[in-house]
């Protein structure tokens, strides 16, 4: 669990980058993309993905300029159907997000919880609220000041993609953050 494995420069013209990361023992690798004045973005590449000896595409990570009122999805903070439990992967990413927030003390955020359209709309609204509050509590445990955070669930009212497949539904069970 080292803090920084590699730092790399991104091509200013097209935004492309490549990295070779060598480890003695297979372990999960967190890829964080940072740029001053831009939103947090990261992805976790599991040791299973790394041990496949295939080239890994870091899932089209991009940094977006921070704008008040705009929603940003925290990659890989996804949930199982009807669950508000934070997976180990989600907790790992939230620790990195907490670090980002502590480095950017001026930011106040609204944490938004979302669900797919499976089940009852009222239950989904309550579930999404529990998800958002669970993320807020975790960030507070990681040292982010409570007064900088608020949390709200939106249920199934704001899908990111149509709920037409299991893959899409998984993407809609997500957490976004909005700059206040």
Where are these regions (language model features)?
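Periplasmic OmpA-like peptidoglycan-binding domain that tethers envelope proteins to the cell wall
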Residues: 104, 110-180
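Periplasmic peptidoglycan-binding/tethering modules of Gram-negative envelope proteins
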Residues: 2-108
């Amino acid at each position: 669990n080292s803090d920084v494995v590699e730092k790399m420069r991104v091509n200013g013209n097209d935004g492309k980058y490549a990295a070779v990361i060598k480890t003695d023992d297979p372990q999960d690798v967190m890829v964080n993309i940072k740029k001053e004045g831009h939103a947090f973005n990261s992805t976790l590449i599991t040791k299973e993905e790394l041990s496949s000896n295939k080239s890994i595409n870091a899932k089209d990570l991009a940094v977006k300029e921070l704008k008040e009122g705009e929603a940003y999805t925290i990659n890989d903070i996804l949930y199982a159907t009807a669950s508000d439990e934070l997976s180990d992967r989600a907790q790992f990413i939230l620790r990195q997000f907490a670090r980002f927030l502590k480095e950017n003390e001026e930011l106040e955020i609204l944490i938004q919880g979302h669900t797919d359209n499976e089940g009852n709309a009222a239950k989904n609204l309550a579930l999404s609220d529990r998800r958002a509050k669970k993320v807020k509590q975790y960030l507070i445990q990681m040292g982010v000041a409570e007064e900088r955070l608020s949390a709200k669930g939106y249920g199934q009212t704001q899908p990111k993609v149509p709920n037409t497949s299991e893959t899409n539904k998984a993407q809609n069970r997500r957490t976004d953050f909005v700059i206040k």
